[in-house]
């Protein structure tokens, strides 16, 4: 049986900026807040962490800082996927050397590889490292998605342990859970689908919302893991308006704005991402109100 890197809620943590650089002191504070809030794992340098506009040195600084600050209290998962297999391998090796517990590798964007190309790409990354590799399927952002046949082929690799499924394609998710071996784990990649995917057999979520409400996302996944789905459904519904507001514009624009509204870190983004519109900021502020005592 393959190792399950984590069960529960892993935060796809934001990368706080200060001027032209990353704010590592603010990053430390965000990590501590996550651990105190019950977060089960931390994903650094993912989509929410604006990996696409980080330099290599910035990515490595954030990964190394996360490993050091977490200090083995929860698993650290580094986003190491790019649209270049060679670059992904180099970044994956460097992240492994920094001490991460696992890697999150997105489907290569823009190139629009065939399914055979995806199998070869992910296999080459997994061949190059010893830590577990989690696939990341998010076709709305990358322009290409994995099929269940691709998952079946990749599940045979000893280092490839599962997938962050952000397609919201429930036929694909159910086929994956039915047809891939039991040790191939599925995690939700969409906050709003967490309870539904876990009811089918998923083991948790890699969460944007956990940046704002870590305790609630942890509680939601724990209820699911304990098969208390009536209570989990009620909590999922309670979170619905907040989750919707966190995706009123492209991620991570709203969550960065939410972090600033709550005084947690700067809402600064890097172009081509820009600040949230006034209309959506008002929507977000309203959605945050029920959770302000909890943050």
Regions found by a protein language model. Give the residues of each.
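Short helix-capping segments at alpha-helix termini
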Residues: 68-74, 98-99, 129-131, 156-159, ...
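General structural feature for long, well-ordered alpha-helical segments within catalytic domains
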Residues: 23-30, 58, 62, 87, ...
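C-terminal alpha-helical cap/extension of soluble enzyme domains
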Residues: 8-16, 37-39, 199-202, 206-295
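Catalytic alpha/beta core domains of metabolic enzymes, predominantly
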Residues: 127-128, 139-247
């Amino acid at each position: 049986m393959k190792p399950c890197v984590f069960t529960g809620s892993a935060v796809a943590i934001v990368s706080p900026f200060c001027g032209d650089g990353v704010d590592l002191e603010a990053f430390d504070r965000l990590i501590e807040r996550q651990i105190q809030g019950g977060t089960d794992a931390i994903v650094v340098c993912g989509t929410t962490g604006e990996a696409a506009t980080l330099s290599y040195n910035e990515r490595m600084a954030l990964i190394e800082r996360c490993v050091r600050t977490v200090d083995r209290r929860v698993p650290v998962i580094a986003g190491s996927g790019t649209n270049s297999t060679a670059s992904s391998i180099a970044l994956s090796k460097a992240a492994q050397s920094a001490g991460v517990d696992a890697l999150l590798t997105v489907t290569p964007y823009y190139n629009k590889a065939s399914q055979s190309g995806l199998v070869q790409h992910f296999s080459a990354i997994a061949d190059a490292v010893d830590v577990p590799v989690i696939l990341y399927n998010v076709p709305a952002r990358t322009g290409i998605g994995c099929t269940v046949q691709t998952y079946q082929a990749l599940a045979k690799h000893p280092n490839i342990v599962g997938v962050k499924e952000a397609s919201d394609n429930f036929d694909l998710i159910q086929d994956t859970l039915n047809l891939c071996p039991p040790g191939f784990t599925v995690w939700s990649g969409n906050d709003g689908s967490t309870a539904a995917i876990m009811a089918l057999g998923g083991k948790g979520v890699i969460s944007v919302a956990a940046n704002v409400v870590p305790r609630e996302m942890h509680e939601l996944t724990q209820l699911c893991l304990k098969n208390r789905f009536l209570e989990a459904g009620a909590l999922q519904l309670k979170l619905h308006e907040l989750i919707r507001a966190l995706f009123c514009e492209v991620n991570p624009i709203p969550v960065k704005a939410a972090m600033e509204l709550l005084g947690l870190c700067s809402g600064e983004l890097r172009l081509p991402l820009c600040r949230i519109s006034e209309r959506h900021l008002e929507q977000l502020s309203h959605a945050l109100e029920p959770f302000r005592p909890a943050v």
